[in-house]
């Protein structure tokens, strides 16, 4: 067998091995969540009567939000908030304290490292119904 054929075969094997290793190390696809923070002080997810989010521990999450202006807003132009709190003690989860401006926005986040029940709350006084702007958020092991 000639030296060039050996080199080609070796190259093909190395390339196949690199592709296999790349697949094994590749990140799983992100969990995409599309929701609306609406003018009636409600979070809404298409197809769900009661909005609820379920993710896995440490999962990458792409949050696509359409925010519609309510009756009031912050001086910085934020019209709604999206903050994740632990349900058991109402402490905020780092990285999940978002201020929403009018229109469409996208956030790349990492799901909490602790499984359990959480709650999403609006942190901008958006209307008289602001206190009812919340939804369940579950993190699975």
Predicted regions and their residues:
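Bacterial N-terminal signal peptides that target proteins for export
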Residues: 2-14
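Extracytoplasmic copper-binding redox domains, predominantly the cupredoxin/blue-copper superfamily
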Residues: 25-141
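Bacterial N-terminal signal peptides
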Residues: 12-23
């Amino acid at each position: 067998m000639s030296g060039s054929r050996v080199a080609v075969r070796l190259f093909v094997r190395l390339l196949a091995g690199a592709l296999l290793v790349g697949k094994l190390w590749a990140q799983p696809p992100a969990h995409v969540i599309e929701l609306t923070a609406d003018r009636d002080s409600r979070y809404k997810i298409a197809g769900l009567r009661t909005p609820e989010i379920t993710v896995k521990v440490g999962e990458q999450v792409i949050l696509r939000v359409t925010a519609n202006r309510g009756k009031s807003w912050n001086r910085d132009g934020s019209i709604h908030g999206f903050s994740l709190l632990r349900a058991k003690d109402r402490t905020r989860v780092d990285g999940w304290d978002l201020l929403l401006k009018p229109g469409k926005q996208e956030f790349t986040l990492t799901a909490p490292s602790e499984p359990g029940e959480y709650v999403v709350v609006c942190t901008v006084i958006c209307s008289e119904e602001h206190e009812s702007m919340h939804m369940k958020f579950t993190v699975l092991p």
